[in-house]
């Protein structure tokens, strides 16, 4: 029989049976059970035949429906089922669909089970060889093992401490410690590469080694480098200062011949003698002694200065600038020489640039920029990139650059005094540089402090007092090493 016909017969038999029972109950005062027991035989036989037909139709149409509690237990505990296929899956969708179709929407106690709403978790995975693994894959749960977490933290901490301690150095004399990731050979290679690029860029504008300005700058730089050699803790004999001209070099000649050539061309010494007042002769060197004792156990890092081949290059360009690359390459533009006529003024600028090389400011700047870049990448996830770049420049990069310039001024002042030049020239030089470069941007939007601020810092009593003490030792015939150290 077709399902539709069976359904109709079932409904008709139910209605007819219910109507007959209600009619008989209304005609008698007995209960349904007593009525069935005491009813005449024809009525009982008719009821039994009707019930038999109803039960047979029901068995043929519906399978055995599980009780509510049993279905719930199979859904919640599929592993405990006697069916082997139910250990890793729930009740099949075919069986559930058949039950929902036979319920006809009349029995509200039956469960309309949806396998996609409460699918049990599968605690295994199958690899490409069809092998079942009952462990979670992936590194997502390594932190749940306390032993693994302890090992990772311990190894990471030891590695981080080793990295920090192994790359932390002490700057000569200032005793400031800084963290540098760039190795010394790489720093030297970087300086030499930049120096070769500068030669190619200004090819044809580099003054020859025999030019008066080249000889003058070379002699001033040599005095500053000699002062640096005397001031460092390791007293090594370095190679002579050479000139990096593309033409003939004076490296093979004697210093005496070079000085005689300079004196013949100039006729007189260009250094201006500055006399002291009586008040300047009375100095209190207590602050100097404290500075010597400060961090006396810390060993200053000077290995990056060993084996350096110092070279000087004078470029014929109207640029008021000079710089010293990490490999000991000094570049001076004629625009600077046109504004600063005296040797003491030129020595102030060269001493400042050499101070950058002594303190490894280029390598430190590369390391700082690396940390700044990592911080910016993190902030990009939360803040607008333009705002992050602006705030990073204002509060990180520019303050760091100004700090390096002030430190180079301080080291350069001591080198100037140790080279035999009056350190009281330095404040006027930086003030003049500020006027030439322009201090309109102020101290917050510039990589260099203003000329007035640099002049004020160098003119402070304690800083200038220390430099004057070194200068007087040199003038008295001593090397000035004790004062420098």
Swiss-Prot record:
Residues 17-147 are mitochondrial matrix. Residues 1-16 form a transit peptide. Residues 169-485 are mitochondrial intermembrane. The chain crosses the membrane at residues 148-168. Residues 456-485 are annotated as: Required for protease activation. GO terms for cellular component: mitochondrial inner membrane; mitochondrion. The keyword Transmembrane helix applies. It is a single-pass membrane protein. It is found in: Mitochondrion inner membrane. Its cofactor is Zn(2+). Keywords: Hydrolase, Membrane, Metal-binding, Metalloprotease, Mitochondrion, Mitochondrion inner membrane, Protease, Transit peptide, Transmembrane, Transmembrane helix, Zinc. CDD domains: M48C_Oma1_like. GO terms for biological process: cellular response to heat; proteolysis involved in protein catabolic process; response to osmotic stress; response to oxidative stress. Protease that is part of the quality control system in the inner membrane of mitochondria. Metalloendopeptidase that modulates the oxidative phosphorylation (OXPHOS) system and plant growth. Involved in tolerance mechanisms to heat, osmotic and oxidative stresses. Belongs to the peptidase M48A family. This is Mitochondrial metalloendopeptidase OMA1. It comes from Arabidopsis thaliana (Mouse-ear cress).
